[in-house]
Amino acid sequence: MPMLNAQQFLNQFSLEAPLDESLYPIIRDICQEVKVHGDKALKMYNLTFDHTKTDHLEISHEQIKAAFDTLDEKTKQALQQSYERIKAYQESIKQMNQQLEESVECYEIYHPLESVGIYVPGGKASYPSTVLMTATLAQVAGVENIVVVTPPQPNGVSQEVLAACYITQVNQVFQVGGAQSIAALTYGTETIPKVDKIVGPGNQFVAYAKKYLFGQVGIDQIAGPTEIALIIDDTADLDAIVYDVFAQAEHDELARTYVISEDAQVLKDLESRIAKALPNVDRYDIVSKSIANQHYLIHASNFDEACHVMNTIAPEHASIQTVNPQPYIEKVKYVGALFIGHYSPEVIGDYVAGPSHVLPTNRTARFTNGLSVNDFLTRNTVIHLSKDTFDQIADSAQHIAHVEALYNHQQSILIRQS
């Protein structure tokens, strides 16, 4: 991980396409199989991909409640606190939406989506936080039917995931994962209902299925590997920064970590501490590969250059740990979420800060936003004009219609003026 100056980094900075195009035929075949054969195909794929025989795809409400009831008290309280903070934050956003009406003639009105599917990753780890960071938003929006899909496990779906489903009042939970679960939510099967929108992170198969099926169903985003970029100075706690970097790297060997500073010595000191801590880090195989191939130390010459580098990266997570972080809040524009100060580490945002941890990756923060209650609402523009207002603007409307040679448009106005 050699240190680069800002210009060197920008000259060589590029992101590979987040998806492997060779997966396209596989995804297409899986989706078609689910569309035609429904539950039978899902059970076959559970056996083929997840090595789990599932006689029943749906997990009963009794099982979901039992998972919550038998959960240890400390975990239960942690999940509950996370839920309450997420809910409060999203309710504040929804309240702002209700205050958007500016006139009685033109305004916006919001309606919840009718049904939403949430993908919760499985595999080697359990992710109750994903349930909280997605289903809570749908609940606050007022979505009528919230459906969770998650890969089957030989010992059953994680009790923590089921407990989070109970807390967020998820309607149905199905043990099916991968591209096949996205197809099931898109088309519907004998057991799994068709939904209007699918959200939640997943592997390349999940991401590609969402891309392939978009248009037939709404989606949140096409997620790439996770990433963090930090701007630090000599007041930063470098031991804490080491674990901010490791925390991101342990997600995926393709996870990207960037550290930017105007102080070259700070970067050298951090490099030494990372090298010292790395051999003993948990999840070494994943972290070490990420650090070796996707970790960057970037020396910026001044404040503006540091911000320019950050905006060019447009990371999923940005962290500012400097003596005076406030100026960065306006200058750093293109990030999924901005974490300010020593006591706002990115990891706190993964779990309990309040905003959703489902954020844009792979530079898409330059044109899109993190998941919020708004993603579970439709926004209708209402136009209800008085005769006086119509009379004031009708001539302009009919003239523009005439200029565009849309004479029936023009006549629609003229007939009301007569």
UniProtKB/Swiss-Prot annotation:
Signal sequence region: none
GO CC, one annotated term: cytosol
Keywords noted in UniProt: Amino-acid biosynthesis, Histidine biosynthesis, Metal-binding, NAD, Oxidoreductase, Zinc
GO molecular function: histidinol dehydrogenase activity; NAD binding; zinc ion binding
EC id: 1.1.1.23
Alphabetical list of PROSITE patterns matching this protein: HISOL_DEHYDROGENASE (PS00611)
Organism domain of life: Bacteria
Annotated substrate binding sites: T226, Q248, H251, H317, D350, E404, H409
Enzyme class at the top of the EC tree: oxidoreductase
UniProt binding sites for NAD(+): Y119, Q180, N203
Amino acids binding Zn(2+): Q248, H251, D350, H409
Residues annotated as catalytic: E316 (proton acceptor), H317 (proton acceptor)
Alphabetized InterPro entries for the sequence: Ald_DH/histidinol_DH, Histidinol_DH_CS, Histidinol_DH_monofunct, Hstdl_DH
Chemical reaction(s) catalysed: L-histidinol + 2 NAD(+) + H2O = L-histidine + 2 NADH + 3 H(+)
Cofactor note: Binds 1 zinc ion per subunit.
One Gene Ontology biological process: L-histidine biosynthetic process
Annotated metabolic or biological route of this protein: Amino-acid biosynthesis; L-histidine biosynthesis; L-histidine from 5-phospho-alpha-D-ribose 1-diphosphate: step 9/9
Function comment: Catalyzes the sequential NAD-dependent oxidations of L-histidinol to L-histidinaldehyde and then to L-histidine.
Family: Belongs to the histidinol dehydrogenase family.
Protein name: Histidinol dehydrogenase
Species: Staphylococcus aureus (strain MRSA252)
Lineage: Bacteria, Bacillati, Bacillota, Bacilli, Bacillales
Gene that specifies this protein: hisD
